[in-house]
Amino acid sequence: MMTAWAVLGGFVLDAIFGDPAWLPHPVVYMGKAISRLEKFLRARLPKTPQGELLGGAVLAFCLPVGTLLFTGLVCWGAAMLHPLLGLAVQMFWCGQALAAKGLVQESTNVYAELKKGSLPAARKAVSRIVGRDTEALTAEGVTKAAVETVAENASDGVIAPLLYMLLGGAPLALTYKAINTMDSMLGYKNEKYLYFGRAAAKLDDVANYIPSRLAALLWIMAAAFTRNDAKGAWRIWRRDRRNHASPNSAQTESACAGALGVQLAGPAYYFGEYYPKPTIGDPLRPIEPEDILRADRMMYVASRFALAWGCAIRGFLG
């Protein structure tokens, strides 16, 4: 029952405060640890495919295990001092593991700049939440990028952390965030990370396999509750959910594309390199800035479904 309260409290904290810039965030420290471990391992292992595979595997083992042990020890120590202190620490970290409000704030900034007609500012705003190159994006491209990242991060930034914190509290949720951060930094199929980032990418695929599919189903339900096209969401999800190199990334994107009646994904540039990617959804109408707000609403509704059912099940199980 304490875990359910910690999750509920963390959700409320994220909904109210988001991720204040002045407050240190665990993902920042995870990123620094990844960079330092990568530098350390690359300097000491052979610069061969086998050496890079080994180095990436060592990093993919050390960071999640270290995160789980450290956060678990802190939560245990706090609970030993006083149960309410343990609950407070869990709530705080659960809130930091969620990214719903931050995602909505950033995507809304993109929407605001598009409505002003300021394409350079919109490109800059969307560059804060996507990994692709944004310098040459059209207004339609900026809108697509924002909608796609809301859909994908509904799983990575909200539903998946919720699932893991319901299973194992803040320590397991932050361990998931460590895995997700590794994939964000290392999981590229370019010359630098083709071998070194493989273990991180595969681990992220495993960690997101169930959450991404659950998130897609919740998104389809949210489409019905927000007066979007739930039937279209179901149809496009069934058809296009595998239209991505990752087995998970197209799950919520396809549901979102179908719910909105637009086409997402397609080719993009990353770090100056062209990546051909299949499209997701049918272009029943042109995408428009308001689709960013529609995606935000569906993400919020889906996350509340996940919270309500997850806490109810967790509370029932004890």
Give residue ranges: language-model regions.
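Hydrophobic alpha-helical transmembrane segments
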Residues: 1-175, 179, 187-318
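Glycine-rich phosphate/dinucleotide-binding loop and adjoining beta-alpha-beta core of small-molecule
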Residues: 184
